[in-house]
From Swiss-Prot:
The keyword rRNA processing does not apply. It comes from Human immunodeficiency virus type 1 group M subtype J (isolate SE9173) (HIV-1). Keywords: Activation of host caspases by virus, AIDS, Aspartyl protease, Capsid protein, DNA integration, DNA recombination, DNA-binding, DNA-directed DNA polymerase, Endonuclease, Eukaryotic host gene expression shutoff by virus, Eukaryotic host translation shutoff by virus, Host cell membrane, Host cytoplasm, Host endosome, Host gene expression shutoff by virus, Host membrane, Host nucleus, Host-virus interaction, Hydrolase, Lipid-binding, Lipoprotein, Magnesium, Membrane, Metal-binding, Modulation of host cell apoptosis by virus, Multifunctional enzyme, Myristate, Nuclease, Nucleotidyltransferase, Phosphoprotein, Protease, Repeat, RNA-binding, RNA-directed DNA polymerase, Transferase, Viral genome integration, Viral nucleoprotein, Viral penetration into host nucleus, Viral release from host cell, Virion, Virion maturation, Virus entry into host cell, Zinc, Zinc-finger. HIV-1 lineages are divided in three main groups, M (for Major), O (for Outlier), and N (for New, or Non-M, Non-O). The vast majority of strains found worldwide belong to the group M. Group O seems to be endemic to and largely confined to Cameroon and neighboring countries in West Central Africa, where these viruses represent a small minority of HIV-1 strains. The group N is represented by a limited number of isolates from Cameroonian persons. The group M is further subdivided in 9 clades or subtypes (A to D, F to H, J and K). InterPro entries: Aspartic_peptidase_AS, DNA/RNA_pol_sf, Gag_p24_C, Integrase-like_N, Integrase_C_dom_sf_retrovir, Integrase_C_retrovir, Integrase_cat-core, Integrase_Zn-bd_dom_N. The gene is gag-pol. Protease: The viral protease is inhibited by many synthetic protease inhibitors (PIs), such as amprenavir, atazanavir, indinavir, loprinavir, nelfinavir, ritonavir and saquinavir. Use of protease inhibitors in tritherapy regimens permit more ambitious therapeutic strategies. Reverse transcriptase/ribonuclease H: RT can be inhibited either by nucleoside RT inhibitors (NRTIs) or by non nucleoside RT inhibitors (NNRTIs). This is Gag-Pol polyprotein. It catalyses: Specific for a P1 residue that is hydrophobic, and P1' variable, but often Pro; Endohydrolysis of RNA in RNA/DNA hybrids. Three different cleavage modes: 1. sequence-specific internal cleavage of RNA. Human immunodeficiency virus type 1 and Moloney murine leukemia virus enzymes prefer to cleave the RNA strand one nucleotide away from the RNA-DNA junction. 2. RNA 5'-end directed cleavage 13-19 nucleotides from the RNA end. 3. DNA 3'-end directed cleavage 15-20 nucleotides away from the primer terminus; 3'-end directed exonucleolytic cleavage of viral RNA-DNA hybrid; DNA(n) + a 2'-deoxyribonucleoside 5'-triphosphate = DNA(n+1) + diphosphate. One of its GO terms (molecular function) is DNA-directed DNA polymerase activity. Residues 73-77 are annotated as: Interaction with membrane phosphatidylinositol 4,5-bisphosphate.
Length: 1432
C-alpha cells in the first residue's frame, strides 16, 4: 500500500483528500481509492505506474474511454478516479468528481479542435500512444508494432476467468484498440482451444466477409500503378492480405480502417457466443424472495450486457425492468424513491431488504405491537388453554420464582412441607426422566431356542399378552409366549385405540412413562388436583383412581390423570396389568449395510413355469419359513423378482428350494472375502480335548439389511395361473446370494470375539458354519466350556444341532478326518471306468489334488494333458498309455492310508524336495523324520525355456509361501542339488529369486547345470559375429555369421521371424565352431534365453542349441547394440541384410519422425525404439529446427547417492516452476506452482517423498527453501536438507543444467499446449522417457528405477550373498570429473563401495559411485563407456 500511496506526495495528497466523491456528498477521496485504482489497472493489463504522472493518467483515460458505453460499473468508477487524479496532477482546482469529468471533456474538445486544425495545415507532429499497434518511425513512415505478450496474456486470462460472459466484449474492444487484422487473428489464435466458440466466430466472419464482397464489387480491369488494390472480405479478415497491405489500407488517403471493420465483425460473432454461453434473457431476471437487492442488480446487469440492443433500449430496460422485476419488499421502497433515482440511491435504500434478517426485523416490529397473543405449537389439544405464568414463591401472576423479588418462602413450593426443596420432592408425578427400571420385580427373560428362532429377525416390538392379567414369574422366568399375541412393531409410533369411560380415544403405548395421562375427557367420580413434571415443564392434572380401560380386548383398572398433555399416554401402571412386554427376537446382530452397484437397479426376471409337485413343495417350504420370520409376504408395489425352483435332496424324497440369484449377484456391490482360504489341519496344534460343531441354518440366523430386502423378492406361481403368485422377500441372508458368506463370517467373528477373550486357552477355528474347538483341559472341563459356547451362540440366535455335534474322534472337519494325534483326508475312492468323459477326468484330478496334500508322490500331469483345449464336459476322452500308467501309480499310492501329524511350535519345520522327472516335483514338510505334517506336488512350467535349477527355486518359493500361510514361518529346506551347482547359478541369478536357508540332500536324481557360459572372452578361441533378419511381409529370412578369422556363412530361411533367424545364426555358429567359442550377437532376445542356461525348451530350435552347448567345453556369449560400427558385427549385418533388412528400418523412419515431432526424442532413443541405423536417426534430429540449440553441460563433482535430489525454482512466462532432479539418474519431477512460498515447496517435497525414496534434498538458500514449512516437512518425512554454498561447483549444478534442459524441451513443445503447466508436464515426460544416453544407454526414467532396484537388492541380499560381481560400478576420482568404469563390485557398505578396476582394488565414496546391473555389454567398444548424464 505504501508504494501506491507514493502516487501523490505532500500538498497534492492534501488536495486529493479534499475532493468529494459526489456533488453535495459527505465522502471524500482517500489513499484507499488510489490503491484500488492501481489494482484494477493491473487486472485490466494496464501499467499502474502511469498513475504517477499527468501524462500517464491521460494515456489511461484514452484507453478506458471506448469501453465506457458497454463497460461494467467498475470501469466507469476507474475512469472517474483517474480523471480526478489527472486534475490533481495538473493542479486544476475541482470540488468533486463531476467537476473533474467536465474539465476532462473541455480539455478533450480543445485537443480535438487543435488536431483537426493541425491536420488541415499538414503539420501533424503529435505522438501516437505506444499502445497502438501502428506507430511512426523517425522517417515518419507507419510501422507495425506487434501486440505485447502482456496484452495477449490479459486477453487469455479474461477468457479463462470469465469464459464468454458479457464482460468479454468491452475487454476485447479495449485490448484490441487500433489493431490490424493480423493482430486480431493473433488474439483469436491464443484462445483457439475453445473450438465450439471459434467455429461460431468463424461462421460469422465468413458471413460478414461475403456481405462485404456483395456490397463492394471489385472494379473491372487492372489496378493502376502506385494505386493500392481495394480489400476483399477475406483481405479484411487477414487470410489473403499481408501486414504491409493492411498498414497501407489503414494509413492510406483516404484510409480504409480494415482493423476496425474486422473488429466489428468479431464483436458481432462474440455477441452470438455470449448469447449462447449466457442464455438467460433480461426478462427472466427476477429478484428472489430472500435474495439481497445487490445480488439481483449484479445478475440484472450481467444479463443486460449480453442483450444485443442499442444503448437507448438498454437504458429503457434499466429504468423499467429493474424496478418491475424486483421482489415486493424492494419494489415498495423503489417506487417510493420516484422515477429519477440513481442506481446508487436504489442500492442504498434496499440495503438489507429481502434477506432473512429483514424478515426477522419486520416480524419483531409486528410482534412488538401485538399484546399477549399466545402462539401454541401443538395440535388442537390446547384450543382454549391459556398458559398464565405464576410464581411458586409469592403466588402472584406475571413472573416465575427465579425472578421473584419477595423473600424466599420456607419449605417445598410443590407440597408446602418443610425440610426439603421442590427439586427433592417425593410427591408422585409423571416422571419422564426416571431412573427406575420397568420390571424391577424380575430379570429380563431369556428365550428358549425354539422361541428365539420362531420370531422375525427384524422385530423389536412390544407384545400384549392375552390371558393372565400379570406376567408369569416362574422359578426360571422362562415362560413360553404363545404366538397369537397382538404384535405392535416399532417402525411407527405404537398408537392404539382405547375405550375409557364409554369413549374411544387414540393413545400412545409408552413403556418409559410411569403414569397414564389423557387430554381433556369427562370422567365420572371424584378427583384430586395434582401437578406432574413432563418434558415440556410442569402441568396441572386431575387424578381419578380405579378407572377401567380396555385395550386390544383386554381390561385393566388403575389411576388415570387428566390434563393438557400433547398426546394421550398409556403408562406402565396400565401396561404391566395388560402383560405387555418388549421383545427382542432372533439374533440382535447389527445388520451389515449393503447396496447395489452404482447406477444399477434390482433384478426383474420373470418366474418360469414349474410342475405341480414343485409348486406344492415350494409353497410348504415357504409357509414354514414365513412362520419362522425368515421371509415375509410382499405386495405388488415391489417391482423386483428373481426366479425360484426346487430340486430333490440327495438320497431323499425331500425337496430343496433354490433361488437363482445370478442376476442379483451381478448387480450387488462387491464384498471383500473375509477368509482368503480354508484352514489346514497340518497347522493345528496337538490338543488334549477336541470338539467339532456345526451351526444349523447358518445364513438364516443373520438378518439382512432392511433397505436391501426388497431386491430378494421372488414369486411362487400357481398351477395354470389359477390365482396370482404368492410374493415373498427375504429377511435373513439368502442361500446363493454373493453377500451371504462374507456377512456371515463377519457376524460370526464379532459374536465369537467376547468368548475368545474370556477363554484364551481355547482354540476356535471357524470356517463358515464349521467350528473346530480344541483345548488342553480335562474332558469334563472342556465339555463345560463347549456348553458355554453353545449357549453363547444361542443367545445370538445361532443354533448348534446335536446331530452335528461331534464329541468323540475321529472328527470329520472340512473334508479331513481328525484323530487325537494324527489327521488324514477323508477316504478317497477312485472310480473304475471303461469310458472317461472330460467331466470324469476333472473330478478325478480334483480328488487326486486333494489327496496329494498328505499322500506323497501323486502325479496328475498326463491326466491333465487329456483335457487340454476347448472340449465339452460330456466328450469321451481315450486314456493315453502315459495317463493309464500315472493313474495306476496313483491308485497304488492311495491303497495304504497315510496320516499326517500335528504341529509342535517348539520344533523347527523341515521341507524336503524330490525331482520326479518330466517337470514334476514332490515335497514333504515334517518336524520328525517319517512323520509328515503335509505333502504336496509342483508341476508348473512358468516359461518356455527353463532349467531344473530355476524350477527348483520356484518349488522352494511355493513351499515357503504355503508354510507362511499355515504356520507363519518358513521351513529349513533339504534340496537335491549340490552347493557348487547352486552357487554357480545363484551368482548370475541371485537378483531374480530368494531362497531361504537350505542344505544338500543326496536324493537321486540330482539337479545339475548341463553347461556353463564364461564370464570373459576366451583367449585364442574363434569369435563368431552372428545376425539374422527377416522380411515381415514375405516371411523370408537369412541367418549367418562372420568370424574374426575371415570365415563367413549365410543361409536362407522361409516362413521365419526376426527372432528365429537370430537363434538360427547362433545355432550355425555353434555347429561350425570348435570346442571353445566366442559368440557376439545383437539380439537381446537370443541373449536372454541362452544366458538363463535352460536345459529344456518348448522350442525345437532352442533344444538343438542346448544340445550343441552341452558338447562345448567353453562358450562365451556377448551382446552388442545393433549396427554399432563394430567390425565383424557390421560385416555380418550387411551380409544378412541384402534384400532383407532394407525394408525393416525404412518402415520405422516415418514412425520415428512422427514421434520426434511430438516428443523431440534424441537420436539414441529413436535408434533403439525404431531399430534405425544411427545415421538415419541423427539425420531426423538434424533436420528438426527446434533441436539445433544444444550446448554442452558443465560437470562438477556431485553427490550421486540414490536418495539425493536437488530442488530449485526457475521462471518462465512470468510463472514459477519448481524442479526436482534425482542426481544419480537425471530423472525430473516439475510443477508450475502458484507462488514461490515455503508452503508450496513443502507440499511439493511431501508429494515427491510419497512417490520416490527421498533421503536428502539439496536446495539453494532461497527464503522458500529455508522456511519453517519446508523444515517441518523434511523433519516429518525424515529427509536431510542440505543447502548450496555460493561459488561451490558441487552446489546446484545438476538442477541448474536440468532447468536449462527443461526450458529447451518446453520451447520445442510449447505450441502444442495452451497452458504452460501442460507444456511443463509434457517436457518432463519427454526428458524422463524419450531421451536416452549416458550410463547404460538408458532414459532417465529407466535409470532411476534401475538404480533404486539395484540399491534395494544390494542392501537386502548382501546378508546372504558374497558373489555380487554381476554388478558394474561407474565411479569418479576426487580430482577427475570423467566417469570411469565399468569396475566389478566387491562390497557395498553404507558410506563407500569396494571395487576392482582391472587388477586394482579401490574404495570409492558411495556418493561418487553408480551401481548398475551388467547386461553383457563388455564387447560394445568405446561407445559403451558411460558417457555423461545427459545425451551425447
Amino acid at each position: 500500500m505504501g508504494a501506491r500511496a507514493s502516487i501523490l506526495s505532500g500538498g497534492k495528497l492534501d488536495d486529493w483528500e479534499k475532493i468529494r466523491l459526489r456533488p453535495g456528498g459527505k465522502k471524500q477521496y482517500r489513499i484507499k481509492h488510489l490503491v484500488w485504482a492501481s489494482r484494477e489497472l493491473d487486472r485490466f493489463a494496464l501499467n499502474p505506474g502511469l498513475l504517477e504522472s499527468a501524462k500517464g493518467c491521460q494515456q489511461i483515460l484514452v484507453q478506458l474511454q471506448p469501453a465506457l458505453q458497454t463497460g461494467t460499473e467498475e470501469i466507469k468508477s476507474l475512469y472517474n478516479t483517474v480523471a480526478t487524479l489527472y486534475c490533481v496532477h495538473q493542479r486544476i482546482e475541482i470540488k468533486d468528481t463531476k467537476e473533474a469529468l467536465d474539465k476532462i471533456e473541455e480539455i478533450q474538445n480543445k485537443n480535438k479542435q487543435q488536431t483537426q486544425k493541425a491536420e488541415t495545415d499538414k503539420k501533424d507532429n503529435s505522438q501516437v500512444s505506444q499502445n497502438y499497434p501502428i506507430v511512426q518511425n523517425l522517417q515518419g513512415q507507419p510501422v507495425h508494432q506487434a501486440l505485447s505478450p502482456r496484452t495477449l496474456n490479459a486477453w487469455v486470462k479474461v477468457i479463462e476467468e470469465k469464459a464468454f460472459s458479457p464482460e468479454v466484449i468491452p475487454m476485447f474492444s479495449a485490448l484490441s484498440e487500433g489493431a490490424t487484422p493480423q493482430d486480431l487473428n493473433t488474439m483469436l489464435n491464443t484462445i483457439g482451444g475453445h473450438q465450439a466458440a471459434m467455429q461460431m466466430l468463424k461462421d460469422t466472419i465468413n458471413e460478414e466477409a461475403a456481405e462485404w464482397d456483395r456490397v463492394h464489387p471489385v472494379h473491372a480491369g487492372p489496378v493502376a500503378p502506385g494505386q493500392v488494390r481495394e480489400p476483399r472480405g477475406s483481405d479484411i479478415a487477414g487470410t489473403t492480405s499481408n501486414l504491409q497491405e493492411q498498414i497501407g489500407w489503414m494509413t492510406g488517403n483516404p484510409p480504409i480502417p480494415v482493423g476496425e471493420i474486422y473488429k466489428r465483425w468479431i464483436i458481432l460473432g462474440l455477441n452470438k457466443i455470449v448469447r449462447m454461453y449466457s442464455p438467460v434473457s433480461i426478462l427472466d431476471i427476477r429478484q428472489g424472495p430472500k435474495e439481497p437487492f445487490r445480488d439481483y442488480v449484479d445478475r440484472f446487469f450481467k444479463a443486460l450486457r449480453a442483450e444485443q440492443a442499442t444503448q437507448d433500449v438498454k437504458n429503457w430496460m434499466t429504468d423499467t425492468l429493474l424496478v418491475q422485476n424486483a421482489n415486493p419488499d424492494c419494489k415498495t421502497i423503489l417506487k417510493a424513491l420516484g422515477s429519477g433515482a440513481t442506481l446508487e440511491e436504489m442500492m442504498t435504500a434496499c440495503q438489507g431488504v429481502g434477506g432473512p434478517g429483514h424478515k426477522a426485523r419486520v416480524l419483531a416490529e409486528a410482534m412488538s405491537q401485538v399484546t399477549n397473543t399466545n402462539i401454541m405449537m401443538q395440535r388442537g389439544n390446547f384450543r382454549d388453554h391459556k398458559r398464565i405464568v405464576k410464581c411458586f414463591n409469592c403466588g402472584k401472576q406475571g413472573h416465575i420464582a427465579k425472578n421473584c423479588r419477595a423473600p424466599r418462602k420456607k419449605g417445598c413450593w410443590k407440597c408446602g412441607k418443610e425440610g426439603h426443596q421442590m427439586k427433592d420432592c417425593t410427591e408422585r408425578q409423571a416422571n419422564f426422566f426416571r431412573e427406575d427400571l420397568a420390571f424391577q420385580q424380575r430379570e429380563a427373560r431369556e428365550f428358549s431356542p425354539e422361541q428365539t428362532r420362531a420370531n422375525s429377525p427384524t422385530s423389536r416390538e412390544p407384545r400384549v399378552r392375552r390371558g393372565d392379567p400379570l406376567p408369569e414369574t416362574g422359578a426360571e422366568g422362562q415362560g413360553t409366549v404363545s404366538s397369537n399375541f397382538p404384535q405392535i412393531t416399532l417402525w411407527q409410533r405404537p398408537l392404539v385405540t382405547i375405550r375409557i369411560g364409554g369413549q374411544l380415544r387414540e393413545a400412545l403405548l409408552d413403556t418409559g412413562a410411569d403414569d397414564t395421562v389423557l387430554e381433556e375427557i369427562d370422567l365420572p367420580g371424584k378427583w384430586k388436583p395434582k401437578m406432574i413434571g413432563g418434558i415440556g415443564g410442569f402441568i396441572k392434572v386431575r387424578q381419578y383412581n380405579e378407572v377401567p380401560i380396555e385395550i386390544e380386548g383386554k381390561k385393566a383398572i388403575g389411576t388415570v390423570l387428566i390434563g393438557p398433555t400433547p398426546v394421550n399416554i398409556i403408562g406402565r401402571n396400565m401396561l404391566t396389568q395388560l402383560g405387555c412386554t418388549l421383545n427382542f427376537p432372533i439374533s440382535p446382530i447389527e445388520t451389515v449395510p449393503v447396496k447395489l452397484k452404482p447406477g444399477m437397479d434390482g433384478p426383474k426376471i420373470k418366474q418360469w413355469p414349474l410342475t405341480e409337485e414343485k409348486i406344492k413343495a415350494l409353497t410348504q417350504i415357504c409357509a414354514e419359513l414365513e412362520e419362522e420370520g425368515k421371509i415375509s409376504r410382499i405386495g405388488p408395489e415391489n417391482p423386483y423378482n428373481t426366479p425360484v425352483f426346487a430340486i430333490k435332496k440327495k438320497d431323499s424324497t425331500k425337496w430343496r428350494k433354490l433361488v437363482d440369484f445370478r442376476e442379483l449377484n451381478k448387480r450387488t456391490q462387491d464384498f471383500w472375502e473375509v477368509q482368503l482360504g480354508i484352514p489346514h489341519p497340518a497347522g493345528l496344534k496337538k490338543k488334549k480335548s477336541v470338539t467339532v460343531l456345526d451351526v444349523g441354518d447358518a445364513y438364516f440366523s443373520v438378518p439382512l439389511y432392511e433397505d436391501f430386502r426388497k431386491y430378494t423378492a421372488f414369486t411362487i406361481p400357481s398351477i395354470n395361473n389359477e390365482t396370482p403368485g404368492i410374493r415373498y422377500q427375504y429377511n435373513v441372508l439368502p442361500q446363493g446370494w454373493k453377500g451371504s458368506p462374507a456377512i456371515f463370517q463377519c457376524s460370526m467373528t464379532k459374536i465369537l470375539k467376547p468368548f475368545r477373550e474370556r477363554n484364551p486357552e481355547i482354540v476356535i477355528y471357524q470356517y463358515m458354519d464349521d467350528l473346530y474347538v480344541g483345548s488342553d483341559l480335562e474332558i469334563e472341563q472342556h465339555r463345560r466350556k463347549i456348553k458355554e459356547l453353545r449357549e453363547h451362540l444361542l443367545k445370538w440366535g445361532f443354533y448348534t444341532p446335536d446331530k452335528k455335534h461331534q464329541k468323540e474322534p475321529p472328527f470329520l472337519w472340512m473334508g479331513y478326518e481328525l484323530h487325537p494325534d494324527k489327521w488324514t483326508v477323508q477316504p478317497i475312492q477312485l472310480p473304475e471306468k471303461e469310458d472317461w468323459t472330460v467331466n470324469d477326468i476333472q473330478k478325478l484330478v480334483g480328488k487326486l489334488n486333494w489327496a496329494s496334500q498328505i499322500y506323497p508322490g501323486i502325479k496328475i500331469k498326463e491326466l491333465c494333458k487329456l483335457i487340454r483345449g476347448a472340449k465339452a464336459l460330456t466328450d469321451i476322452v481315450p486314456l493315453t498309455r502315459e495317463a493309464e500308467l500315472e493313474l495306476a501309480e496313483n491308485k497304488e499310492i492311495l491303497k495304504e492310508p497315510v496320516h499326517g501329524v500335528y504341529y509342535d511350535p517348539a520344533r523347527e519345520l523341515i521341507a524336503e524336495v524330490q525331482k520326479q522327472g518330466l517337470d514334476q516335483w514332490t515335497y514333504q514338510i515334517y518336524q520328525e523324520p517319517f512323520k509328515n505334517l503335509k505333502t504336496g506336488k509342483y508341476a508348473k512350467r512358468r516359461s518356455a525355456h527353463t532349467n531344473d535349477v530355476k524350477q527348483l527355486s520356484q518349488v522352494v518359493q511355493k513351499i515357503a509361501l504355503e508354510a507362511i500361510v499355515i504356520w507363519g514361518k518358513t521351513p529349513k529346506f533339504r534340496l537335491p542339488i549340490q552347493k557348487e551347482t547352486w552357487e554357480t547359478w545363484w551368482t548370475d541369478y541371485w537378483q531374480a529369486t530368494w531362497i531361504p536357508e537350505w542344505e544338500f540332500v543326496n536324493t537321486p536324481p540330482l539337479v545339475k547345470l548341463w553347461y556353463q557360459l564364461e564370464k570373459e572372452p576366451i583367449m585364442g578361441a574363434e569369435t563368431f559375429y552372428v545376425d539374422g533378419a527377416s522380411n515381415r511381409e514375405t516371411k523370408v529370412g537369412k541367418a549367418g555369421y562372420v568370424t574374426d578369422k575371415g570365415r563367413q556363412k549365410v543361409i536362407t530361411l522361409t516362413d521365419t521371424t526376426n527372432q528365429k533367424t537370430e537363434l538360427q545364426a547362433i545355432y550355425l555358429a555353434l555347429q561350425d565352431s570348435g570346442i571353445e567359442v566366442n559368440i557376439v550377437t545383437d539380439s537381446q532376445y537370443a541373449l536372454g534365453i541362452i544366458q538363463a542356461q535352460p536345459d529344456k525348451s518348448e522350442s525345437e530350435l532352442v533344444n538343438q542349441i542346448i544340445e550343441e552347448l552341452i558338447k562345448k567345453e567353453k562358450v562365451y556369449l556377448s551382446w552388442v547394440p545393433a549396427h554399432k560400427g563394430i567390425g565383424g558385427n557390421e560385416q555380418v549385418d550387411k551380409l544378412v541384410s541384402s534384400g532383407i533388412r532394407k525394408v525393416l528400418f525404412l518402415d520405422g523412419i516415418d514412425k520415428a519422425q512422427e514421434e520426434h515431432e511430438k516428443y523431440h526424442s534424441n537420436w539414441r532413443a529413436m535408434a533403439s525404439d525404431f531399430n534405425l541405423p544411427p545415421v538415419v536417426a541423427k539425420e531426423i534430429v538434424a533436420s528438426c529446427d527446434k533441436c539445433q540449440l544444444k550446448g554442452e553441460a558443465m560437470h562438477g563433482q556431485v553427490d550421486c547417492s540414490p536418495g539425493i535430489w536437488q530442488l530449485d525454482c526457475t521462471h518462465l512466462e512470468g510463472k514459477v516452476i519448481l524442479v526436482a532432479v534425482h542426481v544419480a539418474s537425471g530423472y525430473i519431477e516439475a510443477e508450475v506452482i502458484p507462488a514461490e512460498t515455503g508452503q508450496e515447496a513443502a507440499f511439493f517435497i511431501l508429494k515427491l517423498a510419497g512417490g520416490w525414496p527421498v533421503k536428502a534434498i539439496h536446495t539453494d538458500n532461497g527464503s522458500n527453501f529455508t522456511s519453517g514449512a519446508v523444515k517441518a516437512a523434511c523433519w516429518w518425512a525424515d529427509i536431510k536438507q542440505e543447502f548450496g554454498i555460493p561459488y561451490n561447483p558441487q552446489s546446484q549444478g545438476v538442477v541448474e543444467s536440468m532447468n536449462k534442459e527443461l526450458k529447451k524441451i518446453i520451447g520445442q513443445v510449447r505450441e502444442q499446449a495452451e497452458h504452460l503447466k501442460t507444456a511443463v508436464q509434457m517436457a518432463v515426460f519427454i526428458h524422463n522417457f524419450k531421451r536416452k544416453g549416458g550410463i547404460g544407454g538408458y532414459s532417465a526414467g529407466e535409470r532411476i528405477i534401475d538404480i533404486i532396484a539395484t540399491d534395494i537388492q544390494t542392501k537386502e541380499l548382501q546378508k546372504q550373498i558374497t558373489k555380487i560381481q554381476n554388478f558394474r560400478v561407474y565411479y569418479r576420482d576426487s580430482r577427475d570429473p570423467i566417469w570411469k568404469g565399468p569396475a566389478k563390485l566387491l562390497w557395498k557398505g553404507e558410506g563407500a563401495v569396494v571395487i576392482q578396476d582391472n587388477s586394482e582394488i579401490k574404495v570409492v565414496p558411495r556418493r561418487k559411485a553408480k551401481i548398475i546391473r551388467d547386461y553383457g555389454k563388455q564387447m560394445a567398444g568405446d561407445d559403451c563407456v558411460a558417457g555423461r548424464q545427459d545425451e551425447d
